[in-house]
Design a protein with these regions (language model features):
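N-terminal beta-loop-helix "entrance" segment that forms/cooperates
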Residues: 73-86
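Amide-donor transfer/coupling interface in amidating biosynthetic enzymes
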Residues: 1-74, 89-95, 99, 126, ...
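Cysteine-nucleophile active-site neighborhood
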Residues: 105-174
């Protein structure tokens, strides 16, 4: 998917170096089509790394995408320059009168806190409520998924005895669902979290369907019955070295952290990790964009 982003965004050069088609404004306006407008609410502290990961996945089909980066105004960003945030990110007040074909909400490492304790929780709730009328389809990732499930359905998260950390095998529970089309019988997904949502709780909510599951890491993909909201408990967007960075960071801090499972070659952290989740990640995001955004969203977004 040709993706239209600011040519000065760090992700632009990184993606071009990977031979990913990044479209300039000049090229985009010369094409007589309406691009999909996708809003990315980036809650992660690693802003540049995460925005690049999400943009990479959004670029993998022939439809033109125009991505907009969103931050929460009620949280002070410390891991990236203010210049970067001012130049490339908007706040809710900037976009609240706009409409979007799709929205991606990332995770963030605040899961050990109660939702209401997160400093931008009220703002996030306003964005969730706004998205009901201003966004056609949304894709929520990890803590973003837990937060949305809690806001929309009152679904609780539970503390795990040990961090769910590694790359785990999953199966589809509905192979005929369009989001699952093209996936292998078993596919791999990275997870990195201290909390979980439970299958039994989800089963009590008639508006939700579990699409994929892992015997080790539990519920993975969830959809509402309208197929306008999708929730992922994993991190399909992760790079080869993302879990390694998290592991070595925690080791440096002296934290009690196990090796990520099914990740390092020969379970040896000195060896390069083997990527086995990328094809599934591309399929899931391409299916979401194609079947649930491109094929369903109105041409005139004002009619949402």
């Amino acid at each position: 998917m040709p993706i239209k982003i600011d040519s000065n965004l760090p992700a632009h050069k990184l993606l071009e170096n990977e031979n990913i088609f990044v479209m300039t404004e000049e090229r985009a306006v010369s094409q007589d089509i309406r691009p999909l407008k996708i809003l990315i609410l980036n809650l992660m502290p690693t802003k540049i790394e995460t925005e690049t990961q999400i943009l990479r996945l959004l670029s993998n089909s022939p439809i033109q995408v125009e991505a907009e980066l969103l931050q929460t105004a009620t949280h002070e960003v410390k891991n990236v320059s203010k210049e970067h945030m001012l130049k490339f990110y908007k706040t809710f007040d900037d976009i609240k009168n706009e409409r979007f074909d799709g929205m991606v909400v990332t995770g963030t490492p605040v899961e050990n806190m109660e939702f209401e304790q997160v400093d931008y929780w009220d703002e996030l709730c306003r964005i969730f409520e706004w998205s009901k009328t201003n966004v056609y389809s949304s894709f929520f990732i990890c803590w973003g998924a837990q937060a949305a499930l809690y806001y929309k359905y009152g679904l609780k998260k539970y503390q795990l005895d040990k961090k769910m950390f590694g790359v785990f095998e999953h199966v589809s529970l509905d192979t005929f669902h369009p989001l699952m089309r093209g996936l292998d019988d078993k596919f791999w997904v990275p997870h990195s979290r201290h909390t979980e949502v439970r299958r039994g709780d989800i089963a009590l909510i008639k508006d939700l369907q579990i699409l994929s599951y892992s015997e080790k890491s539990g519920v993975h993909l969830i959809s509402d019955m309208e197929c306008r909201n999708f929730f992922s408990t994993g991190h399909s967007e992760y790079d080869r070295d993302t879990l390694a960075k998290e592991y070595f960071r925690d080791v440096e801090k002296g934290l009690d952290i196990d090796l990520p499972e099914n990740y390092f070659t020969d379970n040896d952290p000195s060896k390069t990790p083997e990527v086995k989740w990328r094809s599934a990640a591309n399929i899931i995001f391409s299916n979401w964009l194609n079947y649930f955004v491109y094929q369903r969203t109105p041409y005139d977004l004002s009619t949402l």
